[in-house]
């Protein structure tokens, strides 16, 4: 996702343009032609007015704590000059005017267009600071978290990581272009535009005007792309938080990519919902709804990995120091980490339950405390090691509905899937019910504290855990997930030799009694013989082949309290690999491009 909100640089809208200034190392000068000036006073108890007859050139010199305003005539004569800080009495008037009171007199400045005024007003708010009028974003976010967040999304490399998520970017473009009637000649707001890629898609669909709001320094790069693509007349980049900037008009549709891990991480969805103050009553939002899916899983290997890491602190003599007193705290810390990776669908022990958020109807406050009750009907017997999470979002347009899914049955995205472990696994039998609650409480670190309580209703055994979504464990290795133990119902060795053909060993490895050349490609392609009737009926049980479908055409997976909503397909292919390394400290949906990303050749087909 891209950052939705911290302000840098001058206004980019309307006719205003920015040039380097001289009031300090961070000062910039924005120029707005065609301004009008009216001076108002009440000396001697009588109202006095004086208006400049000619249009003036207004220059704003932006500094860290104040802004210098000057108006010049066509002869470059300065007719008015002042400095505006937090202590200055000033206010907006109507749609395109601003009034400043200095002593006994006030000056009213009218801008040539509403776009010019919005750019000027956004610059002024940034320069004056927001400590006197704290925005919704500032109230809910620690300053240190916001600084780190916007710095992270200000890197071109991070934007590249997200843009190269083929499923993400391609699905957004398809959803917008296939619903072109929702964009043709319409006014669009792009919340957290990042590089501006979604704004360009809206322009491709025929949008008349796109307001692209971006709070990180990426706004400057987005402006460069807008100019180089000759779209300055249609795309207006507005630096700042969507909670703090001003738009000159209401919009027909809002577009954004606000999803984080488990859908809600980074709390950008709240900025997305806040932007509805600019949405017309009949307006739409892309995405329109979001579904969070959760299901119980069994994974003894993952469970043992976490405990093994904590066993470092069990040493009675580490360089002569007894560490064992901290072993319990280490276990708690490791199990507080949600695990970000992907997995074989066959580790799931029941059909998923989903929790839906309708972005057109939801309020920001609805995301401060999210309670998801669940009741799973177990399809397999074994140990339940925790709950697995993923999400789908739908773009519900006038022509078609397009889905973007992060399900484990679908091509991998940079969101992966998320698993939350129990410290004490629960044993459940097929036919049992596992019930409980997953509670997400928003915190000021732009994330959530997760509380999970689950019990097997038939035995009364219960387990719970508290997790910190801000501090996940990135476990994905780039390899295809292994199937769970016990997934073979016929002999894999016999299947390998009973294919009925002769193999050539391309590796040239010499083994007594075997050919010197051996080609196992057909064996690998054929896969193991798995009895699908014995597996979880959750959509695809193997690695997905999407040669038959269009990207973005899948339906939402999972069930709502036992009602099936999955759509299956079969086949085999290789999914994209997103390598994860230690750079991921944000806890947001990001990938590392330290190694080249493998893009499958069969994931996008424009068929039926």
Curated annotation (Swiss-Prot):
One of its GO terms (biological process) is replication fork reversal. Residues 146-453 form the SAM-dependent MTase PRMT-type domain. Its EC number is 2.1.1.319. Methylation of H3R17 (H3R17me) by CARM1 is stimulated by preacetylation of H3 'Lys-18' (H3K18ac) H3 'Lys-23' (H3K23ac) by EP300 and blocked by citrullination of H3 'Arg-17' (H3R17ci) by PADI4. There is a cross-link at residue 227 (Glycyl lysine isopeptide (Lys-Gly) (interchain with G-Cter in ubiquitin)). Overexpressed in prostate adenocarcinomas and high-grade prostatic intraepithelial neoplasia. Belongs to the class I-like SAM-binding methyltransferase superfamily. Protein arginine N-methyltransferase family. This is Histone-arginine methyltransferase CARM1.
């Amino acid at each position: 996702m891209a950052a939705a909100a911290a302000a840098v640089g001058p206004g980019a809208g309307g006719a205003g343009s920015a040039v380097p200034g001289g009031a300090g190392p961070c000062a910039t000068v924005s120029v707005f032609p065609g301004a009008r000036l009216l001076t108002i006073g009440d000396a001697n108890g009588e109202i006095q007015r004086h208006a400049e007859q000619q249009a003036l050139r207004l220059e704003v010199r932006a500094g860290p704590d104040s802004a210098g305003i000057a108006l010049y005539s066509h002869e470059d004569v300065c007719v008015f000059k002042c400095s505006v800080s937090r202590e200055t009495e000033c206010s907006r008037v109507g749609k395109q005017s601003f009034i400043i009171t200095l002593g006994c007199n006030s000056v009213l400045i009218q801008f040539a267009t509403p776009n010019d005024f919005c750019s000027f007003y956004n610059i002024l708010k940034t320069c004056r600071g927001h400590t006197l009028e704290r925005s919704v974003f500032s109230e809910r976010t620690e300053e240190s978290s916001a600084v780190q967040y916007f710095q992270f999304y200000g890197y071109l490399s991070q934007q590249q990581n997200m843009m190269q998520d083929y499923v993400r970017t391609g699905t957004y473009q398809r959803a917008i272009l296939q619903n072109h009637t929702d964009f043709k000649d319409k006014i669009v707001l792009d919340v957290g535009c990042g590089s501006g890629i979604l704004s360009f898609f809206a322009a491709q669909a025929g949008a008349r005007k796109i307001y692209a709001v971006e709070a990180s320094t990426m706004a400057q790069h987005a402006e460069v792309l807008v100019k180089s693509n000759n779209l300055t007349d249609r795309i207006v980049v507005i630096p700042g938080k969507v909670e703090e900037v001003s738009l000159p008009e209401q919009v027909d549709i809002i577009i954004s990519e606000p999803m984080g891990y488990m859908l809600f991480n980074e709390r950008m969805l709240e900025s997305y919902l806040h932007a509805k103050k600019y949405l017309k009553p009949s307006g739409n939002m892309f995405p329109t709804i979001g579904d969070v899916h959760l299901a119980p899983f069994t994974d003894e290997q993952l469970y043992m990995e976490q405990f093994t890491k904590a066993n470092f602190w069990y040493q009675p003599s580490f360089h002569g120091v007894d560490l064992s007193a901290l072993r319990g705290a280490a276990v708690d810390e490791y199990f507080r980490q949600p695990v970000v990776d992907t997995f074989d669908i066959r580790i799931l022990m029941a059909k998923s339950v989903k929790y839906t958020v309708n972005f057109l109807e939801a309020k920001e406050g609805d995301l401060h405390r999210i309670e998801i009750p669940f009741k799973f009907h177990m399809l397999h017997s074994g140990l339940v090691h925790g709950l697995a999470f993923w999400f789908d979002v739908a773009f519900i347009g006038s022509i078609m509905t397009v889905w973007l899914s992060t399900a484990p049955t679908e091509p991998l995205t940079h969101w992966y899937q998320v698993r939350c472990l129990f410290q004490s696994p629960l044993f459940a039998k097929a036919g049992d019910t596992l019930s409980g609650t997953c509670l997400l409480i928003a915190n000021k670190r732009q994330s959530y504290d997760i509380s999970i309580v689950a019990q097997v209703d038939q035995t009364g055994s219960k387990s719970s855990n508290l997790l910190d979504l801000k501090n996940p464990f990135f476990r994905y290795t780039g390899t295809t997930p292994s199937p769970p133990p016990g997934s073979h119902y016929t002999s894999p060795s016999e299947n390998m030799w009973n294919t009925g053909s002769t193999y050539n060993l391309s590796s040239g490895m010499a083994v007594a009694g075997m050919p010197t050349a051996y080609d196992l490609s057909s064996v690998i392609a054929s896969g193991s013989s798995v009895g699908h009737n014995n597996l979880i009926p959750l959509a695809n049980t193997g690695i997905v082949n999407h040669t038959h479908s269009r990207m973005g055409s899948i339906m939402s997976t999972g069930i709502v309290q036992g009602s099936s909503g999955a759509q299956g397909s079969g086949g085999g292919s290789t999914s994209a690999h997103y390598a994860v390394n230690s750079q991921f400290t944000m806890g947001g949906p990001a990938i590392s491009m330290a190694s080249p990303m493998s893009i499958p050749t069969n994931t996008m087909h424009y068929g039926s």
